């Protein structure tokens, strides 16, 4: 009798988590025992965040659903309302696709939505990135909840695997796999500083990289925190004679305020 092919429904909502997910689903789709399908949602469908759906499509995955649930209101209500919309749409997709596993990463809206839908629809939930911790943000308890609701766990460090076992997860379901994104770093062709400098249009002999995301516990402070950060980096850069490059924030409430501070700094330096 032929062995049944297992359906894996992977869910991705932002480029940072797709970077972790990619090596896993890329390997799985090459295995004759698995059929890999993707749900693409969230920031991937946002022009403001680079419309990264096109990158996923260029990777030639079978995208079975695009869920545009992101509410860019810059208010505390946006993530909770967005999760509700995502759960509703994802439930319909799971009912249609009927996967054997739902595969997801981390601690964002997609993660908790996958955890809830998988459990209520009797589908095995496979979670990557549990056991980690972050302070001052909703992501920490959300990640913990995802771990409690997941059936199989892949952690990025042995310490995180131990953390899951300490909170009661069965050791036989917890696997220390390392961070899959390390494979991407290994596989990316090397590029010289000269080439990067030309692309970014500044000197990379001495440089600093700045990135700041808003905290859910201090959303109202986001603008002032970023202004203070930029002032400090500006002073430091002048003292040390280095260049600084900034990266835009994520989609969380407060991100518009951080972006406003960046745009103001950009205007002042022109």
Locate the predicted segments by residue.
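Conserved nucleotide-sugar phosphate-binding/catalytic loop shared by glycosyltransferases and other
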Residues: 35-79
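A generic structural motif
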Residues: 31-37, 62, 239-244
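Cofactor-binding loop segments of dinucleotide-utilizing enzymes, especially the Rossmann-like FAD-
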Residues: 13-14, 40-43, 130, 179, ...
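Short internal beta-strands
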Residues: 37-42, 153, 243-250
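Active-site and donor-binding regions of nucleotide-sugar-utilizing enzymes
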Residues: 7-12, 18-29, 69-171
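A nucleotide-sugar donor-handling region in carbohydrate enzymes
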Residues: 12, 45-47, 149-222
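Nucleotide donor/acceptor-binding cores
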Residues: 5-6, 206
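Donor-nucleotide binding loops and adjacent catalytic segments primarily
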Residues: 191-270
